[in-house]
A protein has these predicted regions:
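Helix-to-loop junctions at the C-terminal end of transmembrane segments
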Residues: 51-65, 158-160
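C-terminal ends and interior cores of transmembrane alpha-helices
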Residues: 75-94
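Cytoplasmic helix-loop-helix junction between adjacent transmembrane helices
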Residues: 105-143
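Cytoplasmic membrane-interface "Motif A"-like loop-to-helix N-cap segments
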Residues: 61-75
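Symmetry-related core transmembrane helices of the 12-TM Major Facilitator Superfamily/SLC fold
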Residues: 166-183
Length: 233
């Protein structure tokens, strides 16, 4: 299979996983008696994004090929999301917030690193194949947005917006992507000679130095505000 087509499928599934529940889970949480906790379900995504991508990024750089780490994260995330959905379906109106939220949080914790890993995999494979990442990656990434929209519509048209089934679908797509990444994507060798970094550098905290540049500071501030508004809407 052509490398670009492989990456298109990967990006499509990557964001299709997210689109199954991101815009619709509040319609399930409210009637299920968890309406007052909806904010927590969205905010925990940002919380785990602070440290989980860094931890798995370090592992992918040094010990595990990036495409395998991507597969393992999606497999874990898919299983936890499917478990959350299955629990919600079986519990019905008596679903316990603590149990459901714990399963959901674990699913999100393993999904968030895959956003950065998917970009790393795509860039590495394009470079290995002799492609220009600046020119060739954007058309591939567009299919991620297409995947998000398609899965969002699918959940809407099937009437699963108000059901825990949306999390089961999320888990199924995540598991599918895990198998796809593990068995079809080319291998990305790990870097054995990665230079040792300080704790600050390993966590990427040195990036805050960019705030010294006015243009970058304005860009980051408005990006954060945009991220907040996206979660609210």
């Amino acid at each position: 299979m052509n490398l670009k087509l492989r990456l298109i499928i990967m990006n499509f599934l990557q964001f299709a996983v997210w689109g199954t529940y991101l815009t619709s889970m509040s319609r399930y949480l409210g009637p299920a008696g968890m309406g007052e906790h909806i904010g927590l379900f969205y905010s925990v995504q940002g919380l785990v994004s602070i440290f989980m991508p860094t931890l798995f990024g370090i592992l992918a750089d040094r010990y595990v090929p990036a495409q395998r780490m991507l597969a393992l994260c999606h497999l874990a995330s898919g299983l936890f999301m499917a478990a959350a959905g299955a629990y919600g379906l079986s519990a019905g109106p008596s679903v316990a917030f603590g149990t459901f939220f714990a399963l959901y949080t674990l699913g999100v914790a393993f999904y968030m690193p895959t956003l950065a890993l998917s970009y790393s995999v795509a860039y590495s494979l394009l470079e290995q194949g002799g492609y220009d990442t600046v020119r060739d990656f954007p058309p591939i990434r567009v299919f991620g947005t297409v995947g998000f929209i398609c899965s969002m519509w699918a959940v809407d048209l099937t009437g699963f917006q108000t059901s825990a089934m949306q999390f089961v679908i999320c888990g199924a797509l995540g598991t599918l992507l895990a198998h796809y990444a593990f068995f079809t994507l080319p291998n990305i060798p790990v870097s054995r000679d990665v230079e040792r970094k300080s704790f600050v550098e390993a966590l990427g905290l040195n990036a805050f130095r960019l705030f010294r540049k006015r243009q970058m500071a304005v860009f980051f501030i408005f990006s954060m505000m945009l991220g907040v508004s996206l979660q609210i809407t």
